[in-house]
């Protein structure tokens, strides 16, 4: 599982 959270 890959969780990508940009700080946008």
Swiss-Prot record:
GO biological process assignments: flight behavior; neuropeptide signaling pathway
Source domain of life is Eukaryota
The keyword Secreted is annotated on this UniProt entry: yes
Q: Which residues carry this modification: Pyrrolidone carboxylic acid?
A: 1
Q: Which InterPro entries match?
A: Adipokinetic_hormone_CS
According to the UniProt entry, which residues carry Tryptophan amide? 8
Give an example GO molecular function. hormone activity
Q: Which PROSITE patterns match?
A: AKH
- Where does this protein reside within or beyond the cell? Secreted
Which keywords accompany this UniProt record? Answer: Amidation, Flight, Hormone, Neuropeptide, Pyrrolidone carboxylic acid, Secreted
Which GO cellular component terms are attached? Answer: extracellular region
Please tell me whether the keyword Methyltransferase is annotated for this protein: no
Q: What does this protein do?
A: This hormone, released from cells in the corpora cardiaca, causes release of diglycerides from the fat body and stimulation of muscles to use these diglycerides as an energy source during energy-demanding processes.
By sequence similarity, the record places it as follows: Belongs to the AKH/HRTH/RPCH family.
This one is known as Adipokinetic hormone
């Amino acid at each position: 599982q890959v969780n990508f959270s940009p700080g946008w």
